[in-house]
């Protein structure tokens, strides 16, 4: 590793004199403390990678013939991108932090728990995550909410139109929660989570 070049890059990053270092990723604001820390660690990783990646491959990269993606995370024991098995996590429960999360009993709670899963994954890796067939994966929780509304209908003699409207509202509100939370929560490296949702229909 060229320590003089590493020192120069770190110094230029800290005094913000090299915009290639401070603005290298449009999704990362170098003024945020956690992003600043992430970018600084990335400088070290890129330099260290020069010594651990085969020389001919690094030369290929450095000469511009190709690009080795995510050199700023190369030396970290983090995963890059994943297909989250959220249906299993929701159904069987999981532990996040020190809390044991059990299976949600309604659609709205399932959406809230799903945002917590997304946040935990985003803070434990770099890159994107996919929530495949979200309509299929969340359908059991729409059913749980419907079953609750049917019980309420029976107990209070409510109309079918009323409970159908209540279910529509819960689904809308749950989706809104999922949208707002995943777009406003910031991961440990200072970014909103990169998420792909797909429908199974």
For each feature predicted by the language model, list its residue ranges.
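Catalytic alpha/beta active-site cores
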Residues: 1-201
């Amino acid at each position: 590793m060229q320590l003089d070049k590493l020192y120069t890059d770190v110094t230029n990053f800290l005094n913000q004199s090299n915009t290639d270092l401070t603005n290298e990723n449009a999704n990362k604001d170098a003024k945020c403390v956690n992003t600043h820390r992430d970018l600084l660690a990335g400088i070290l990783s890129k330099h260290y990678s020069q010594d651990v990646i085969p020389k001919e491959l690094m030369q290929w990269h450095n000469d511009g013939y190709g690009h080795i993606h995510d050199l700023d995370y190369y030396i970290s024991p983090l995963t890059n991108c994943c297909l989250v098995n959220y249906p299993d996590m929701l159904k069987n429960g999981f532990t996040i932090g020190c809390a044991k999360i059990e299976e949600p009993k309604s659609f709205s709670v399932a959406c809230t728990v799903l945002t917590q899963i997304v946040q935990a994954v985003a803070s434990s890796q770099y890159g994107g995550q996919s929530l495949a067939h979200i309509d299929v994966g969340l359908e059991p929780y729409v059913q749980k909410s419907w079953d609750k509304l049917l019980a309420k209908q029976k107990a209070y003699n409510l109309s079918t139109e009323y409970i159908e409207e209540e279910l529509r509202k819960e689904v809308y509100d749950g989706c809104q929660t999922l949208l707002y939370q995943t777009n406003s929560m910031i991961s440990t490296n200072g970014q909103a989570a990169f998420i792909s949702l797909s429908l199974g229909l």
